[in-house]
């Protein structure tokens, strides 16, 4: 089972690919960020992100894509940009035939740390520990994407144990 986790954004989109390593363990396959320059026209930024995502899915052939649900904070402009990036993620997944699983930030924290109100540092340390990484993944967007991917992997495992119920 291989899951592509995404932390959406238009300037920097974090991605993390994890897979089941057997015996209840997980392994990081690849992680990083797709970045677009701030002076690039918005439609070209979204196109660049789409192409980067399509390339990741073609190379790694994930069984599912996991993405955080949109969190609407105080900054409406940021929420709009994140919403646009999420749209690109959903389109790229649909074009690649990859099913999408969405998680709230609390669900991601619960899946990774066992505590839905864990702080960012606690989540990052658990991502490092669960994946056996020598250091906390950087930048933060990549660590967040790995956490989302782990939530997706844990959810897929549970669904498989329950006989495919979703």
From Swiss-Prot:
Any one GO biological process: DNA repair
Its Enzyme Commission number(s) read 3.1.21.10
Keyword Ligase applies? no
Catalytic EC class: hydrolase
What cellular component GO annotations does this protein have?
cytoplasm; Holliday junction resolvase complex
Signal peptide span per the entry? Answer: none
Q: Which GO terms describe its molecular function?
A: crossover junction DNA endonuclease activity; DNA binding; magnesium ion binding
Residue intervals passing through the bilayer: none
> Cofactor comment in the record?
Binds 2 Mg(2+) ion per subunit.
**Any coiled-coil ranges, and where?**
none
Reactions catalysed, as given in the entry: Endonucleolytic cleavage at a junction such as a reciprocal single-stranded crossover between two homologous DNA duplexes (Holliday junction)
Compartmental location: Cytoplasm
What keywords are assigned to this protein?
Cytoplasm, DNA damage, DNA recombination, DNA repair, DNA-binding, Endonuclease, Hydrolase, Magnesium, Metal-binding, Nuclease
Question: Which positions in this protein are listed as binding Mg(2+) 2?
Answer: 68
Identify which cofactors the protein needs according to its UniProt entry.
Mg(2+)
Q: Which domain of life is it from?
A: Bacteria
The keyword NAD appears for this protein = no
Q: Which annotated residues bind Mg(2+) 1?
A: 7, 141
Family stated for the protein in its record = Belongs to the RuvC family.
Q: How does it assemble?
A: Homodimer which binds Holliday junction (HJ) DNA. The HJ becomes 2-fold symmetrical on binding to RuvC with unstacked arms; it has a different conformation from HJ DNA in complex with RuvA. In the full resolvosome a probable DNA-RuvA(4)-RuvB(12)-RuvC(2) complex forms which resolves the HJ.
- What function is annotated for this protein? The RuvA-RuvB-RuvC complex processes Holliday junction (HJ) DNA during genetic recombination and DNA repair. Endonuclease that resolves HJ intermediates. Cleaves cruciform DNA by making single-stranded nicks across the HJ at symmetrical positions within the homologous arms, yielding a 5'-phosphate and a 3'-hydroxyl group; requires a central core of homology in the junction. The consensus cleavage sequence is 5'-(A/T)TT(C/G)-3'. Cleavage occurs on the 3'-side of the TT dinucleotide at the point of strand exchange.
Protein name per UniProt: Crossover junction endodeoxyribonuclease RuvC
Chain's gene name: ruvC
């Amino acid at each position: 089972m291989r899951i592509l986790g995404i932390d959406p954004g238009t300037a920097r989109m974090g991605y993390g690919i994890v897979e089941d390593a057997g015996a209840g363990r997980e392994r990081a396959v690849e992680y990083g960020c797709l970045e677009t320059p701030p002076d690039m026209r918005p439609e070209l930024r979204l196109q660049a992100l789409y192409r980067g995502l399509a390339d990741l899915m073609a190379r790694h052939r994930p069984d599912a894509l996991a993405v955080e649900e949109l969190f609407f904070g105080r900054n409406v402009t940021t929420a709009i940009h994140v919403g646009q990036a999420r749209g690109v993620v959903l389109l790229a997944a649909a074009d690649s035939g990859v099913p999408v699983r969405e998680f709230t930030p609390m669900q991601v924290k619960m899946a990774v740390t066992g505590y839905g109100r864990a702080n960012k540092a606690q989540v990052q340390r658990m991502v490092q520990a669960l994946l056996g990484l020598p250091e906390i993944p950087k930048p933060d967007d990549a660590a967040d994407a790995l956490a989302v991917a782990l939530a997706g992997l844990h959810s897929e495992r549970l669904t498989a144990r329950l006989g495919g119920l979703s």
